[in-house]
Amino acid sequence: YTTLFRSSYLDLKQLVTADMPHPTVISEKKFGASWFMPAGDSYIANMYADAGADYVFKELPGAGSTPLAFETVLDRAIHADMWLIKYNQSEDMTYGDLRAEYAPYENFDAFKNRRIYSCNTGLVPYYEEFPLHPDYLLKDLIWVFHPELLPGYSPRYYRKMQD
């Protein structure tokens, strides 16, 4: 199976070329006083690159996540093109829910331009499938960043956040 998944992953990765636009992206949201941003060598930072995105915090050292102050994230990522969030709730989060959770989120361009994509891990099997099928996640990320490469694709995990 591993060879099959690796082959699928590499086939998907080849859809993305260096000369196409690479939208800037940020990840997750603050938890308590900190925003735990994936580090530059984390699986998700690498997958963003493989999917053709420019991860704003790719220089963060390490492979885990780094706690950052909200102001630090806002300063560096206010103009990020896109924002991807994972959460676990009984219903999908909306822009209104995100604003109610923390009003300063609305300062980000990705919020203003309605370019937030969310993965509700309470409703989709992200954590159950991803370890065995990284190709599924990569396909979703390519769809988010470059939908023209996957016409007619119906994403498994990520959805465009609704108002």
Which residues does each predicted region cover?
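Short helices/loops that flank or line small-molecule/ion binding pockets
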Residues: 68-79
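Extracytoplasmic ligand-binding site segments that recognize negatively charged/polar headgroups
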Residues: 22-42
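Append "and occasionally in soluble cytosolic enzymes with long acidic Gly/Pro-rich linkers
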Residues: 6-25
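Short, small-residue-biased leader/transition segments that mark boundaries at the very start
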Residues: 1-4
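Loop/turn elements at helix/coil->beta-strand transitions in domains of secreted/extracellular proteins
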Residues: 19-25, 51-54, 78-82, 112-115
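Active-site rim elements
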Residues: 33-35, 56-61, 124-131
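His/Asp/Glu-enriched short active-site or ligand-binding loop at hydrolase and phosphoryl-transfer sites
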Residues: 44-65, 84-87, 118
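Structured C-terminal subdomain patch of bacterial secreted/periplasmic proteins
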Residues: 85-163
